[in-house]
A protein has these predicted regions:
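Short, charged/polar N-terminal "headpieces" of proteins
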Residues: 1-23
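Intrinsically disordered, low-complexity boundary segments flanking structured domains
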Residues: 1-2, 25-27, 70-71
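Glycine-rich, flexible loop/turn motifs
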Residues: 3, 45, 80-83
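Broad hydrophobic/π-residue packing in well-ordered secondary structure
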Residues: 10-16, 37, 69-74
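A short, structured beta-strand/loop element
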Residues: 15-51
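Short, charged, low-complexity patches
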Residues: 50, 54-58
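C-terminal structural segments of small proteins and small subunits
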Residues: 58-88
């Protein structure tokens, strides 16, 4: 499960889910054992993390949409993802 970014204790991962339940491009954000799945459109698909951190994740997704979509395209081709600048 490739880590594509980390900020404020949040780990952002993106991986290919063959036959998975989420049919849209998305990321997984983990914070202290809790996880939220967020589409690249910024919609929460599943789970939750503390509200303030979830807002940071959604903002980060919006800022980095193009890079995230490029990573998703790489995954679809079976290629390796690249890291994305964290929030500062």
């Amino acid at each position: 499960m490739p880590t594509i970014s980390m900020f404020y204790g949040i780990i952002i991962r993106m991986y290919r889910e063959i036959g998975g339940q989420h049919k849209v491009p998305h990321i997984h954000a983990e914070d202290q054992g809790e996880e939220v799945v967020v589409s690249l459109d910024g919609d929460v698909l599943e789970g939750s993390i503390p509200k303030k951190k979830q807002s940071l994740v959604i903002g980060w997704v919006n800022i980095n949409y193009d890079e995230l979509l490029a990573n998703w395209d790489l995954l679809e081709k079976g290629e390796k993802t690249f890291t994305i600048e964290p929030l500062k």
